[in-house]
């Protein structure tokens, strides 16, 4: 959650609809802890205390991922530039449950194609 998305209501988006254009640098132990927490087994990691993990496990969910929603040709494209560990944890749960449309808690911030190009460059053709 960021300052920009703090007031945005969380929604669920299928994992398969979230584009992750940047290669992440991941800590496998952190992902393991998040997956365990999603399963209701609170697990601490380097960046999450046991108390925080217990709160997430009792809620049965991870904090929402900020995504940018871009309207193009009548459909919304979702781009995630952060939340890499949470998205990997959702990806692992999706594979475990064999559900490519596994729901991801997100806060969607509206964006324009021009704004997305600032992140990805002119090679992106979304108009």
From Swiss-Prot:
GO CC list: cytoplasm; nucleus
The entry's keywords: Antioxidant, ATP-binding, Cytoplasm, Disulfide bond, Magnesium, Nucleotide-binding, Nucleus, Oxidoreductase
Pfam families: ParBc (PF02195)
Cofactor(s) this protein cannot do without: Mg(2+)
Subcellular location(s) per record: Cytoplasm; Nucleus
Induction statement: By hydrogen peroxide.
Coiled coil: none
Role this protein plays: Contributes to oxidative stress resistance by reducing cysteine-sulfinic acid formed under exposure to oxidants in the peroxiredoxin TSA1. May catalyze the reduction in a multi-step process by acting both as a specific phosphotransferase and as thioltransferase.
Protein name: Sulfiredoxin
Species per Swiss-Prot/TrEMBL record: Saccharomyces cerevisiae (strain ATCC 204508 / S288c) (Baker's yeast)
């Amino acid at each position: 959650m960021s300052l920009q998305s703090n007031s945005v209501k969380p929604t669920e988006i299928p994992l398969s609809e979230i584009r992750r254009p940047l290669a992440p640098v991941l800590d496998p132990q952190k992902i393991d802890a998040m997956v365990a927490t999603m399963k209701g087994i609170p697990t601490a990691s380097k960046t999450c205390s046991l108390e925080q993990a217990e709160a997430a496990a009792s809620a049965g969910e991870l904090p929402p991922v900020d995504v940018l929603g871009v309207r193009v040709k009548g459909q919304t494209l979702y781009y995630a530039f952060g939340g890499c560990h949470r998205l990997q944890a959702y990806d692992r749960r999706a594979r475990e449950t064999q559900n490519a449309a596994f729901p991801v808690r997100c806060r969607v911030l509206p964006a324009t194609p021009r704004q997305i190009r600032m992140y990805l460059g002119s090679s992106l053709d979304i108009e």
